[in-house]
Every structure is written in structure tokens, then in C-alpha cells.
Regions:
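Blade/loop signatures of beta-propeller domains
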Residues: 57-83
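Blade-level signature of beta-propeller repeat domains, shared across WD40, Kelch, NHL, RCC1
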Residues: 375-405
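Loop/turn-rich, solvent-exposed surfaces of beta-rich toroidal or solenoidal domains
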Residues: 306-354
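Surface-exposed loop and turn segments in beta-propeller and other repeat-based domains
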Residues: 84-92, 193-207, 245-258, 349-369
Length: 405
């Protein structure tokens, strides 16, 4: 089926797509929208350690007890929870949201956080702090490591939701304002290589269209695919130097199958080398959509009950964070889990959720068990198939390690 938005010259709609989905509404219930107060880089130099963290908050799942040491998961994919793995001194190395996680060639775990004290926190596999740095990326939302010519590079996605430096207190609803986001490529030690800004500069967005990117993936040939999941819901395709190629998606297609709703994450599926394609989360639809590398829609992976993020691949499986469960007709608070799918894109395990069930080949609605997570936002997998999970809106929780058993 041809996507009418898929070309290299066609501009996006003249008005920003309407965010009518309850995903966006729920996000705004938590995030305080308002006028932009200043540029991200001006804000970057403002440090506010006195109120950067609330260590008196209980960092527990909804069940109210620590899951440390418990065994979670189903079938061959079960894990022991190390709930204390990434904990640090919150007055020295604070986090707001553990938004993004990636592993470099040396096996270091790199976390991206939207703290105004440090945007990057670097761990070893034992949870020991190796480094913390950066304030230039106040809306840090996703981090990816790319191995290029024997060298590691960092791609950071700044989504534009930024801590308000003039916030009167540390209450969640008063902490944030929104501005445009951007993409940056860095050396592994944090030196800037280039940035990619608002698509209005390319003529593919109009000035009134929001741009708040949420994720990025690097294809085997070096091309970049960016999801504008908090903005106008397009996937934007660039070459390895950040030059525009095409875009597709949005919310105003004649064929609703081509729409994206809160397109939160993206990954390149290389499990079949002869059939590489993109998996793109349409989180508001509880769906992962399949596209060719040129943006042709190929089909959907429906994940009922799961407001799912982008895929992380390991071997024949992929792992995806679920930020909310759909329960009683709404997005349930503190209801996240991690879902794992096999090479046939069938769910084989839900970590922190109920066991997957298929009836006549159809996946039944999935949901949390409330025992482990609040809102799962990111996951990465090490060489031993252990998982590291970061969360959004989880009382400034550090990452959790899940040890494969």
C-alpha cells in the first residue's frame, strides 16, 4: 500500500497534526506545558542541585514493596531483579527520568537523563559510577551508540521537554516546559560532531508544526531514522551526515493505517539479512508498525494493552519497554513492563507483566502485575543477555538490572 506522504519533496500538512489521542493527553497531565522561557543552551548552564532530587520519595512500584531478588518473566526468559543496581548519591549525581540506555564497545552502560545537573551517567556492568557529565541536552530522551570505522559515537535525542529553571518547587506538574527538540552526534567522550535541528529549516515542516523528537536509529549503511513522537508524528530519514532524504507518517493520511500516533521509538530489524526493515512504535495505537527502509508500510504488530516503545534487538528476539498498560479503558498509572518478542514477532515473555496469551493465534490484551516497574521507558541488553531498564516518572529512580537466569 503506497504512503501518500512518502517522497523527498512533498511538504508536511500546513497545520500541526491534532494530538487527539489519550496518550498525548495523559502526557500533558503530568507535564506542565507553557511558553518557552529560553533556549536550551542558555538553560544548560543553570545548575539547581538544591532541588534536583527528592531522596525522601519512596522509589517503589505500585505494589508498595521492593522487588529486589525476585524472579520475573515467563518461559525461557526469566530474570532476577537487582533493584539497587544503579543507585547513586542523588545529591551528587541526580536523575529526573532514566530516559535512555545504551552500551558501548567497552561494555559501559550509558544512561541519558533530563537532569539539569548531568545529562549522561556512565556505569560499568556492576552498577559502579564511571562518569557523569553534560548539561547541553536538557531534554535528553534517547541515546544510541553507533560503531563507525572502529570508533564509537553517541547520538542523543533531545525531545524538548525541559526542566523549568524558575520552577517554584519540585512538584512534577510545575517542573516542565516544552520547546523544540534536536538531534546531536557526539564522540564517545562528548565532543560535538553535528546537530540536526527543526525540520522547518528543510522546508518539510511549517513554522507552526511542533518538532519534539523521541528516538533515533542508525541503519547498517549509516542512515538515520528519527521519530517525532512528541511533535508531529513523522519519521524523518537522513543520511549519515544528517542530510534529509524523506519523511512519512503523520496523523492526517487518507488511509489511517499509514498514520502514526505518539511514534515513540524506532529500530532496524536485521534478523533476516535479506529482508531488513524498520520497526516503529505507534505507542498511542498499542502497535509496532513495519516499514521498508524507504518508508513503505508493510504491516503491523498489534500489542493490545501495551503502550509500547521502540525495539531493542538481541539475537532472534527483540525487547520493548511498555510505559503504560491499558486497563479499564485508560492508561493506568504505574503500570509499565518489558515485553519480549521472538523471530516471528510473537510475545514470549512479559517482565513485570502477566503471561502472554494467544487465542486462535490472536494475542490477548496484556497488562502489568504492578510488582516491579512504574513506567518503563528504555531497555538495553548486554552480552550476557542481562537487561538494564530505565523509567519515566518513577520518583527519580535509577536504572534497574535484570539478571538472566
Amino acid at each position: 500500500m503506497q504512503n501518500t506522504n512518502l517522497n523527498t519533496t512533498q511538504t508536511a500538512p500546513s497545520a500541526a497534526p491534532s494530538k487527539s489521542s489519550h496518550v498525548d493527553a495523559s502526557k500533558r497531565q503530568f507535564l506542565h506545558g507553557g511558553a518557552t522561557l529560553g533556549s536550551a543552551l542558555l538553560l544548560a548552564g543553570i545548575s539547581n542541585t538544591s532541588r534536583a532530587h527528592e531522596p525522601e520519595k519512596k522509589q517503589l512500584p505500585k505494589a508498595g514493596r521492593s522487588p529486589h531478588g525476585s524472579i520475573i518473566g515467563h518461559g525461557d526468559f526469566q530474570y532476577k531483579v537487582d533493584y539497587n543496581w544503579g543507585r547513586l548519591d542523588p545529591h551528587k549525581v541526580p536523575v529526573e527520568n532514566s530516559h535512555g540506555l545504551a552500551i558501548d564497545a567497552k561494555g559501559r552502560i550509558i544512561m541519558a537523563t533530563d537532569s539539569d545537573v548531568n545529562n549522561f551517567v556512565i556505569y560499568n556492568k556492576d552498577g559502579k559510577l564511571l562518569d557523569a557529565w553534560g548539561t547541553q541536552y536538557p531534554g535528553a530522551h534517547s541515546v544510541k551508540i553507533s560503531h563507525e570505522n572502529g570508533e564509537d559515537f553517541i547520538y542523543i535525542v533531545d525531545c524538548g521537554w525541559v526542566l523549568d529553571r524558575n520552577r517554584p518547587d519540585n512538584q512534577w506538574k510545575n517542573k516542565w516546559y516544552r520547546q523544540s527538540g534536536f538531534i546531536a552526534k557526539l564522540t564517545i567522550d562528548g565532543k560535538l560532531v553535528y546537530t540536526i535541528g527543526h525540520p522547518v529549516t528543510l522546508g518539510i515542516y511549517t513554522p507552526d508544526m511542533r518538532y519534539q523528537p523521541t528516538d533515533l536509529t542508525v541503519a547498517p549503511n549509516g542512515d538515520l531514522y528519527v521519530t517525532d513522537g512528541y511533535g508531529s508524528d513523522f519519521v524523518i530519514h537522513y543520511d549519515s551526515n544528517g542530510r534529509y532524504i524523506r519523511h512519512w507518517g503523520g496523523t492526517n493520511n487518507a488511509d489511517p493505517a499509514l498514520n502514526l500516533v505518539n511514534t515513540h521509538g524506532v529500530g532496524v530489524d536485521t534478523r533476516d539479512p535479506n529482508n531488513q526493515h524498520l520497526l516503529v512504535s505507534s505507542r498511542g495505537e498499542q502497535t509496532i508498525k513495519k516499514y521498508s527502509m524507504q518508508g513503505k508500510w508493510l504491516g503491523d504488530i498489534h500489542l493490545p494493552g501495551a503502550y509500547v516503545g521502540g525495539p531493542v534487538f538481541k539475537g532472534e528476539h527483540f525487547y520493548a519497554p511498555v510505559c503504560w498498560s491499558h486497563i479499564d479503558g485508560k492508561m493506568a498509572a504505574n503500570s509499565g513492563f518489558i515485553t519480549i518478542l521472538d523471530k516471528h514477532n510473537r510475545v514470549v515473555s512479559n517482565l513485570g507483566g502477566l503471561a502472554p496469551e494467544y487465542v486462535d493465534g490472536q494475542l490477548q490484551p496484556m497488562q502489568t502485575n504492578y510488582q516491579v516497574f512504574n513506567h518503563c521507558h528504555c531497555v538495553c541488553v548486554d552480552d550476557d543477555e542481562n537487561l538494564y531498564v530505565g523509567q519515566w516518572n518513577a520518583n527519580q529512580m535509577y536504572p534497574i538490572k535484570l539478571e538472566r537466569v
